[in-house]
Amino acid sequence: MSDSPIKYRLIKKEKHTGARLGEIITPHGTFPTPMFMPVGTQATVKTQSPEELKEMGSGIILSNTYHLWLRPGDELIARAGGLHKFMNWDQPILTDSGGFQVYSLADSRNITEEGVTFKNHLNGSKMFLSPEKAISIQNNLGSDIMMSFDECPQFYQPYDYVKKSIERTSRWAERGLKAHRRPHDQGLFGIVQGAGFEDLRRQSAHDLVSMDFSGYSIGGLAVGETHEEMNAVLDFTTQLLPENKPRYLMGVGAPDSLIDGVIRGVDMFDCVLPTRIARNGTCMTSQGRLVVKNAQFAEDFTPLDPECDCYTCNNYTRAYLRHLLKADETFGIRLTSYHNLYFLLNLMKQVRQAIMDDNLLEFREYFVEKYGYNKSGRNF
């Protein structure tokens, strides 16, 4: 895939770590890396408008193939002119393959060489997703970056199961490449699996790199393993991937995990965490996690985070946010979601600057101490 529509340009390597400052060029524009990608599951980042996402510095967003296939349907989106036009977003979009959603429906799925049979979570009907179908759906959606269909084995699965799984994922990746109808305007990433087994990660990476994908995702992490186990897997996995292609760590959004991923050479991250916790009034701030719904903030007329210059923090107080959330007002969720997304996007901006200044390890130490990870154990 040497004429890939997705290009990675390395700007600088950090002197003391594996961190890389760069940019990714796509048919819908260029974004700087390392980058956090807000998740727009149903072709919308919950409660946020496209204009707000641009305003907060989101260079790319993610949408879910599985959910859009079921509703409203990929063919309908194709008739609308593709996902960008359908949702009025003119910047890059990444779509997942649907594999993780199917994996999370563990009770109702059956995996064979052909693909996966499972129950539609909306109406209980029987569905079948194959590597070819996953690619076809994404071709209809028209995302800039697509994912190969993979199986995401649990981190603590037995070795023999994981070995069979990664070998099947490699065969599925090859089938997906052959089925790809739009290689000139949609890049396709391969997904490295292997749970916590170094030799299986090596085998998976070797298989996929030989297929020359536009970029490589690291899957099967943030699924219940410890923070230390994830870092250990990243330590050896990123080194197996080409220097001239993007590296994407799937499903990771806790602030320390983002920094630790960057230190180990990852360029892209996504997670529903910032919007999911915002709906419960949990906010990430420069001083750590804050649950603004708590009674102690009822008469707190200070900004959510005095060090943050986002729209929420510039205009509203903790007391007002608490009132909105307690009254079940959607505006409260909009404001906390905006802040959390801005916080992670701004964190990545600070990380990019730290790479430029060759002081990423010092920045990590400063951030972790201030955020309170050292005081209360690890907590997003």
Curated annotation (Swiss-Prot):
Active site: 96 (proton acceptor), 270 (nucleophile)
Protein EC: 2.4.2.29
Note on how the cofactor is bound: Binds 1 zinc ion per subunit.
An example molecular function term from Gene Ontology annotations: tRNA-guanosine(34) queuine transglycosylase activity
Binding site for Zn(2+): 308, 310, 313, 339
GO cellular component, one term: cytosol
Keyword annotations from UniProtKB, A to Z: Glycosyltransferase, Metal-binding, Queuosine biosynthesis, Transferase, tRNA processing, Zinc
Cofactor(s) in the UniProt record: Zn(2+)
RNA binding, as annotated region: 251-257, 275-279
Catalytic activity: 7-aminomethyl-7-carbaguanine + guanosine(34) in tRNA = 7-aminomethyl-7-carbaguanosine(34) in tRNA + guanine
Function (record text): Catalyzes the base-exchange of a guanine (G) residue with the queuine precursor 7-aminomethyl-7-deazaguanine (PreQ1) at position 34 (anticodon wobble position) in tRNAs with GU(N) anticodons (tRNA-Asp, -Asn, -His and -Tyr). Catalysis occurs through a double-displacement mechanism. The nucleophile active site attacks the C1' of nucleotide 34 to detach the guanine base from the RNA, forming a covalent enzyme-RNA intermediate. The proton acceptor active site deprotonates the incoming PreQ1, allowing a nucleophilic attack on the C1' of the ribose to form the product.
Family statement drawn from the similarity comment of this UniProt entry: Belongs to the queuine tRNA-ribosyltransferase family.
Designated name of the protein: Queuine tRNA-ribosyltransferase
UniProt organism field: Streptococcus pneumoniae (strain ATCC BAA-255 / R6)
